[in-house]
Amino acid sequence: MKKKINLTQFQTLMLSIWHFMIHLKQRLAEDQINIRAGHLAYVSLLSLVPMVAVTMSMLSAFPVFQGIRGQIEDFIYNNFIPSAGDSVQVYINEFVDNASKGTAVGIAALMVVAIMLISSIDKSLNSIWHTKEKRSMVISFSMYWMVLTLGPVLMGASLVATSYVVSLKVFNGSDLSGVVPLLVERLPMLFSVATFLLIYMVVPNTKVKFFHALLGAIVAALMFEFGKKGFALYLTKFPTYEAIYGALATIPILFLWVYLSWMIVLLGAVITAAMPEYLDKKQSAVEDKNGEKEVVSQVPDVSFSISELPQEQSQEQSQEPSLKPVEESIKESRVK
């Protein structure tokens, strides 16, 4: 009996997943995330150097973060850019060094471009959630500025805290000696999940449930890891861009990877936004079905037995012969 129940539950779960995939396919067709990802990739390439320059300048403002710039760069380039992007790291570092030598007006322009990227991300994600209420200019600018200033600080603080925890003597013992490599190996994955979760919870101007955001964040993080490894494998096994573009191959490679990254981010956002819609639709379908059952149960019973008809006919037939003698007696009396 338990096996049958478990099999039924498994079939119900798979059917629900299939229906959700159909709903997700319709949602992806409506949102057109490929077009949005292209727009965000273009804005990201324009804002990449300003964002990195502002991030490094914010970290350099705090003495505690002065010695970890190299660690942050290595962490970002090794875990969020495919292994074939070593030349990308060199070029970006040169661009950032050149940007940091600019005047105050140039630095302000870089910050404006960086804020434009955050604004584009905000608008794209809110359009996926179909939010009708928009934030005011003051609130939007305050949020963008907070992300631009506090984001690098929080990232640096998390790396410092992780380095401190890993260096504790507790993890250096013989019993826990294998925990440190495992923790360091899983750190980029956990950081990706936390980043996607924060984006899906904070950026939309509507209420998002934690479980829905966590599901979208996990899917996006897994796809990001697989996409990074697959993209690196493609670049190493099939060096098409290097054969065509030569020394300029870094530009299309970087653009393609940024485009794929935004596709993954928007896909996780669509999953998070489509989950409550699917559950509400499923709940309304169940309520409609229950309502139809109640209406059917309230219809009065107008059925009758067919066997009653012959009895009535037999009664009529039995009454007709009883009237014949009376009619004959009346006729005889009239004749007399």
From Swiss-Prot:
The membrane spanning regions, by residue number, are 45-65, 102-122, 137-157, 179-199, 213-233, 251-271
The places in or outside the cell where this protein is found are: Cell inner membrane
The question of whether Transmembrane helix is a record keyword is answered with yes
Listed GO CC annotations: plasma membrane
Keyword hit for Cell membrane: yes
Where is the segment annotated Disordered?
307-336
Give the intrachain disulfide bonds.
none
* Bias (Basic and acidic residues): 325-336
Alphabetical UniProt keywords: Cell inner membrane, Cell membrane, Membrane, Transmembrane, Transmembrane helix
* Comp. bias (Low complexity): 307-323
Task: Specify the domain of life of the species encoding this protein.
Answer: Bacteria
Q: Which InterPro entries match?
A: UPF0761_bac (IPR023679), Virul_fac_BrkB (IPR017039)
Q: How does it sit in the membrane?
A: Multi-pass membrane protein
**Could you say which protein family the record assigns here?**
Belongs to the UPF0761 family.
Give the protein's recorded name. Answer: UPF0761 membrane protein Swoo_4618
